[in-house]
Amino acid sequence: MEANVTIPIWQNKPHGAARSVVRRIGTNLPLKPCPRASFETLPNISDLCLKDVPPVPTLADIAWIAADEEETYARVRSDTRPLRHTWKPSPLIVMQRNASVPNLRGSEERLLALKKPALPALSRTTELQDELSHLRSQIAKIVAADAASASLTPDFFSSGSSNVSSPLPCFGSSLHSTTSFVISDITEETEVEVPELPTVPLLCSASPECCKPEHKTTCSSSEEDDCISLSKASSFADMMGILKDFHRIKQSQDLSRSLLKEEDPAVLISEVLRRKFALKEEDISRKGN
């Protein structure tokens, strides 16, 4: 028997290498039936627009609906697409044709619009926040000015000359910003050249221990301690030169306090209110005595 013998297809075995190519494709790539298209019949559509054509849609209408550019008046193949500026349908036709098939593209756009962040709302929120911060700064200025004017009344200096001569406690940068714009309204001082500071730090405001509760008595005591330590370290220096440097440092410190910029309005308001209530408590204690 010859090796190259042609075997007809109908004599091939239904399995193995001689199996049909169609069966191989069907086994490796199973095909599922396509979903059936469902249609909705409009009530009394034959009396309105369909006279000679039967109102039965076909599969060609599916492609028409998919290619629809947000038009709700052409839903079946028998309809004619008029121009937008010439077509003036009656309200009944518009309601019936819009109810036949929903406009899926419009609903998708509405969903995307809901998912996207509202840019106008965000811009409005930022504008409100900026306006609120501006109002807070204005309120801080008004409260600080009122507190400073109340502190300069004769009742504040009635306790004696000790309160006038003693420096104010170190409340931090917020108190410095309070006095910065109040002093300019009371007295106008000429600008003084700030001398060069020595290498040894003698400023009370530069040390963080000044704002602690145990160091809130006076700033003069800490400056005297620094001066004593400096004199002990430099025993061969002239005492008069040290006192002159100390006086210059004190003047530059007062000038720097008056030139400080405004800080956070919230911190300024809280500090002014705290001072105001402290003054009220002092007045009550004086009246009780």
Swiss-Prot record:
Q: Single GO cellular component annotation? A: mitochondrial outer membrane
Chief localization? mitochondrion
Q: Which Pfam families match?
A: Mito_fiss_reg (PF05308)
Membrane topology summary: Peripheral membrane protein
The record describes its post-translational modification as:
Phosphorylated by AMPK. Upon stress, phosphorylation at Ser-100 and Ser-235 by AMPK is sufficient to induce mitochondrial fragmentation.
Q: Which family does it belong to?
A: Belongs to the MTFR1 family.
Could you tell me what this protein is called? Mitochondrial fission regulator 1-like
Species this protein is from: Mus musculus (Mouse)
